[in-house]
């Protein structure tokens, strides 16, 4: 037993050493860990007058209060939420579709808005956020924030159609007991795209995008050495992916930084690091499709994660508006 324990300890030490060396090497070449934010300072909603802080706040409040609970049992909980999201998306004038799927726990639904591109030969971009919660918790940051950003992004899309088609998806089941299984809502949607022969150019999962802090030391890290590369304040948004996601991380980060909305940092690492694949991009990566996560880093910053204190009053809606603006920057690059 002692020998096994020592082997495990040695393995962890070697992994951290390898990751450290990889991080130092990659800083010179590209973003494994990269201090590459060209924007500093607190965002102001006046920078993008069409994006409404009030809408973001109202959406989170509705999801956390009027439509609570958003837990998977019984399925009628999430059916009410899906109906409401579908109604909001239809108000934008986009084509709205609903994908019902069966699981061992019941039938659930993905809600999909399609912004049709002018060039049908090009691949599609997918931006999605799950609308269920972990147990009975309010789930303001996880993940009413992601749904609110998704809906506000769709509401403020420019009128001219893009060259590449874009899907905006509210996923029905992401939390336990579905997480990591074939019954995640995103897994059902990814398989449908794959079965239809639809080429996915990029998938972005929005998960926990509303908690920010200017307090020193408010940002923590899975490994201490990462403090060498990242700020100690939780005032930035992160683009995260696995070791094979480097080119997609760079594309998303480039578009977000071009919007000059808020600081953007990126991280690329092995999936055994906690949080790397903890969202709907996981389903796409399982099929070999592009997928990255846009996040406030969840439990590494937000002490309310998966707690009853994850309430609307803890979120920063001005910075959520900045995330919407940053995503417009990504779509501008992807759609051209």
Positions of predicted regions on the chain:
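A non-catalytic alpha/beta surface segment that caps or lines the substrate-entry region
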Residues: 8, 24, 47, 61-118, ...
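Hydrophobic membrane-insertion alpha-helices, especially the h-region
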Residues: 8-26
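N-terminal capping segment at the start of a domain
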Residues: 23-77, 132, 300-310
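Second-shell loop/turn segments in exported
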Residues: 40-51, 67-76, 97-101, 133-143, ...
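Catalytic-core environment of secreted peptidases
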Residues: 53-66, 88, 92, 104-171
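Extracytoplasmic/secreted proteins, especially bacterial periplasmic and envelope-associated proteins
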Residues: 55-58, 62, 76, 80-84, ...
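Active-site-adjacent substrate-binding region
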Residues: 202, 214-336
């Amino acid at each position: 037993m002692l020998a096994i324990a020592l082997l495990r300890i040695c393995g962890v030490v070697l992994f951290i050493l390898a990751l450290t060396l990889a991080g130092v090497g990659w800083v010179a070449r590209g973003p494994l860990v990269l201090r590459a934010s060209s924007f500093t300072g607190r965002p102001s909603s006046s920078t993008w007058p069409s994006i409404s802080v009030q809408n973001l706040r109202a959406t989170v409040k509705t999801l956390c209060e009027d439509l609570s609970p958003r837990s998977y049992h019984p399925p009628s909980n999430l059916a009410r939420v899906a109906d409401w999201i579908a109604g909001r998306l239809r108000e934008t004038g986009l084509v709205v579709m609903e994908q019902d799927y069966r699981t061992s726990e019941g039938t659930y639904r993905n809600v999909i808005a399609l912004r049709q591109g002018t060039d049908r030969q090009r691949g599609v971009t997918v931006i999605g956020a799950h609308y269920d919660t972990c147990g009975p918790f309010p789930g303001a940051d996880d993940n009413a924030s992601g749904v609110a950003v998704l809906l506000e992004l769709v509401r403020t899309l420019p009128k001219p159609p893009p060259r590449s088609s874009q899907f905006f998806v509210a996923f029905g089941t992401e939390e336990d007991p579905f997480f990591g299984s074939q019954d995640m809502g995103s897994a059902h949607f990814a398989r449908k795209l794959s079965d239809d022969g639809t080429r996915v150019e990029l998938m972005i999962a929005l998960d926990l995008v509303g908690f920010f802090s200017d307090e020193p030391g408010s940002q923590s890290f899975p490994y201490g050495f990462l403090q060498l590369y990242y700020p100690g304040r939780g005032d930035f948004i992160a683009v995260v992916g696995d070791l094979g996601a480097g080119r997609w991380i760079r594309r998303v980060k480039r578009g977000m930084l071009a919007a000059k909305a808020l600081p953007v940092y990126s991280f690329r690492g092995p999936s055994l690091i906690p949080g790397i694949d903890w969202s709907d991009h996981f389903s796409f990566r399982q099929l070999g499709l592009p997928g990255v996560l846009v996040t406030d880093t969840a439990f590494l910053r937000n002490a309310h994660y998966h707690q009853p204190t994850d309430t609307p009053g803890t979120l920063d809606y001005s910075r959520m508006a900045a995330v919407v603006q940053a995503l417009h920057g990504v779509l501008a690059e992807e759609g051209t």
